[in-house]
């Protein structure tokens, strides 16, 4: 049995990149997050919050981190998100996908994905 928490299409407020006059400036940055967690937090015997992984604090930390200052690259923000995921003992592995839109006039997305397996995430926790 495997279980995941999946967050899709979260538009985050952030300031990424430096653009010159005439360059396309993205209007949105979108985050997808897939967290592998123990099935014991999903396959539960009672309908109680203390039986599940409370992801709201993690989302709040991600939003705060994303909006706190300027980033030159999506990669740096993804790295910070990876460390935030590692702060949660319930998270076993993570798949983080951050993309921006548009990348050419009115079209296209460009994204960066980081997949962190159990061993790599454990290394971030220490």
Describe the residue ranges of each PLM region.
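N-terminal, polar/charged subdomain of small-to-medium soluble alpha/beta proteins
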Residues: 1-126
